[in-house]
Amino acid sequence: MENTVKPQPRRAVVAAAAGFAAAAAYAIVGALQILVWNPLAAVPGATLGQIRAEMARADQPLTANWVLAWGMSGIVLATVVLLVTIIRMNSRVGPVVAAYLVLLVFAAPGHFFAGFGPGMSLADTFLVSGADHAPWGMLLYVVSAASLLALIVLIIRAGRSATAHAVRHG
């Protein structure tokens, strides 16, 4: 009997494109959450320029370096997976989807660490909580949790499929 798990290059490339879009959107929304939306929500009525100026006066600048490094690293990793999928014309959909799910799962702790310094700077300057004030950070964590659940389901299904294939083909 022939192997029933065949490469599906077109479907794999479509999955990679969707995964790239999801990972890039996560990085962009995460950076905007940390650098724009959260400061504006933490200090209602102030402009971003006023918030940044007050933070700089308090020697608690809202620096973007780590945030942008986090976002760009996610986009670079997503690009690598996309390019490998396009170049390898024998990619299967499952591993491509799994790669992007892993990126989305690990984006959450990265987002937390990238946002920790700016959040504490906001807290120290304006005497507010260092936690997220805008809702988008929580949405990103929900996306990561859903990605973890999807990854677990994907792994279980792949294991069951491999076991069934081994039983059928000895």
Label for each model-derived stretch:
Residues W66-N90, G94, A145-L148:
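Hydrophobic alpha-helical transmembrane segments
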Residues T4, Q8-R11, A56-T63, R88-S91, ...:
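Membrane-interfacial loop-to-transmembrane-helix junctions in polytopic alpha-helical membrane proteins
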Residues A108-G170:
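Alpha-helical transmembrane segments of multi-pass integral membrane proteins
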Residues A23-I28, V102-F112:
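Aromatic-anchored segments of alpha-helical transmembrane domains
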Residues M1-L40, L154-T163, G170:
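Cytosolic juxtamembrane helix and N-cap/initiation of the first transmembrane helix
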Residues E2-V14, V80-F106, S161-G170:
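Cytoplasmic juxtamembrane regions at transmembrane-helix boundaries
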Residues A15-A23, G71, P95, A99-V102, ...:
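Hydrophobic alpha-helical transmembrane segments of polytopic
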Residues A21-A69:
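Hydrophobic transmembrane helix segments
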